[in-house]
């Protein structure tokens, strides 16, 4: 009888603790950029790590792959933080179109991500997992190359490719133009081809060039040298293999990352593959931290 009463009290206490959990939008001001960004923050079990989840190129934390990732970790009891990069837009909430004026840089993105990690640490989180989708994975990988943080315990990259390569549509003449423009101190916006933006990516040379370091060789090298335990999750039916070649998966595996391939999934893990992604994310994390 006493044991049953104790169990009931424990269950009530657990329910009360979750009822006091925070879930909502938080803001952070970047002093050096004079910009404020928003993030969705949900507290979970304090004994579990916190997960920072980074969206892909020009999107927000409302993108369906990010929402699914957040939901998976939240349902498993993990604290989650999903920021939206400002891209030089104060409190940005919408995706940015190709033909908008792009003045943001990779360095600014990394500064924002780094300060969000600091934000989590100031909240008392001593175990942090970094999860990225698409270019969000590349940006996290680039950040980890320079940030040696004992509180970052695990990194999971999903749909990890690269941003610069003629096979992706990068035009060498446009790269040459941008370099010469900066040398001449001309930072006026210009139209480029960049990823899914065909001849209509309207960016300053500084902005455009900053992302070009994320080429095939750089991504593979950083992944090979990464000291943080890491996994890379890829969809077997990602259309980007048509551009980069199916040997990309072999090259990823050779870096030493723990490669997981979800059969049938596309770049965004759409439809039923969303659940496969969620299962893999939680399974990887639970196993790594010996969670039940």
Describe each region flagged by the PLM.
Residues 9-18:
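Bacterial N-terminal signal peptides
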Residues 22-44:
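N-terminal cap/lid segment of alpha/beta-hydrolase-fold proteins
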Residues 131-136, 140:
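Gly/Ala-rich beta-loop-alpha elbow adjacent to hydrolase catalytic centers
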Residues 101-104, 150-284, 288:
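The alpha/beta-hydrolase serine catalytic core
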Residues 100-123:
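Alpha/beta-hydrolase active-site loop
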Residues 87-104:
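Cap/lid segment of the alpha/beta-hydrolase catalytic domain
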Residues 1-9:
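Bacterial N-terminal signal peptides that target proteins for export
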Residues 45-88:
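Short, surface-exposed "cap/lid" segments of acyl-processing enzymes
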